Amino acid sequence: MTSAATLNADSPQPVEQRTDVLVVGAGPVGLFAAFQAGVLGMSCVLVDALDRPGGQCTELYPEKPIYDIPALVSCTAQELVDRLMAQCAPFNYPILCGRRAETVETLENEHGRRFRVTTSAGDVFDCAAVLITAGNGAFTPQRVALPEAAALEGRHLHYAVRDTARFTGKRVVIAGGGDSALDWALALRKVAARVTLVHRREGFRAADASVAEMRAAVVAGEMDFVLGMLSRLDSTPDGTLIGAAIRGRDGETVLPCDELIALYGLVSEPGPIVNWGVEMRAGRITVETTAYETSRPGVFAAGDIALYPNKQKLILSGFHEVAMALRRAYRYANPDKTLVHTHSSNDAGLQTKLHVTAE
């Protein structure tokens, strides 16, 4: 699961693949599920609606310290994601980012039951089991709430940066006050004609070091900061963005603008999962607690999206849930085989895959 195995929505061709298990959600629990699938000798593919693995940990609080992961006194959320990526990298399972799982169709034949899963990017998967590790649901960006914004989306208005080259030599306005907004403002100032960061208040929800670097860059004349909110977007008759109006304490200012990047954060919603025929309660999927299987046999749920009595929303709980779920999923993928438990320290085959040797 190196970067080479991570494909985004801009990949040229949709993927068609047969796999033992499809993991929906590439946050920490989904990444550990991939590792567990590898331990069990199962084939696996992960899909995620976000443009990179890590889920909430990467998108919402990458610098947040975590203190309750076994054997780690402390680590940041991003460090945890990086460690999980490294752990499952030897299995080289593909992570398909920027695409949302849309439909789950049951396929029945003389050989048993399988599922046909399609995504928003046109991918089609034939799998023996589906494991939903979607956290609080599919994340979507908070959009610019101006009537003229919709027509500019995808052309000059962006909610993520996928290709820095398109901003080379452009006048770029970045709206937002979190880590992503500051990180991209600092990065793009090196290639854009001019970068202006716009935020509604002086305080930021970002790492102190990033805030300090941004303020130093403003003082040095490398970029601009404007206090206020987007109030209007100006464009030519053919739909080319030319300006962004900012309303601040002293009235309205129009910034010359070729490209607008709005990084207001993400909102979560169950998304298409509500149509997958699994029992849900208060936006979460109910599961039984022997294998965390949903009301639809062969479809499992783990992590924050799973609901059962005395459920604890902890990452370590999700790790346990996927370990149990995959052992039942193994039966569906290999109905003629018996899964024999082997301790990892005695599993020579696993050690070879992980490129380690027992002492």
UniProtKB/Swiss-Prot annotation:
Please give one Pfam family short name.
Answer: Pyr_redox_2
What is the free-text note on the cofactor? Binds 1 FAD per subunit.
List, separated by semicolons, the cofactors it needs: FAD
Instruction: Please give the Gene Ontology molecular function terms for this protein.
Output: ferredoxin-NADP+ reductase activity; flavin adenine dinucleotide binding; NADP binding
Q: Which reaction does it catalyse?
A: 2 reduced [2Fe-2S]-[ferredoxin] + NADP(+) + H(+) = 2 oxidized [2Fe-2S]-[ferredoxin] + NADPH
Q: Where does FAD bind?
A: D48, Q56, Y61, A101, F139, D304, S345
- Keywords (A to Z) from UniProt: FAD, Flavoprotein, NADP, Oxidoreductase
Could you say which EC number(s) this protein's record lists?
1.18.1.2
InterPro entries noted in UniProt: FAD/NAD-bd_sf (IPR036188), FAD/NAD-binding_dom (IPR023753), Fd--NADP_Rdtase_type_2 (IPR022890), Ferredoxin-NADP_redctase_2 (IPR050097)
Question: Subunit structure, briefly?
Answer: Homodimer.
Member of which family? Belongs to the ferredoxin--NADP reductase type 2 family.
* Protein name according to UniProt: Ferredoxin--NADP reductase
| Lineage of origin | Bacteria, Pseudomonadati, Pseudomonadota, Betaproteobacteria, Burkholderiales
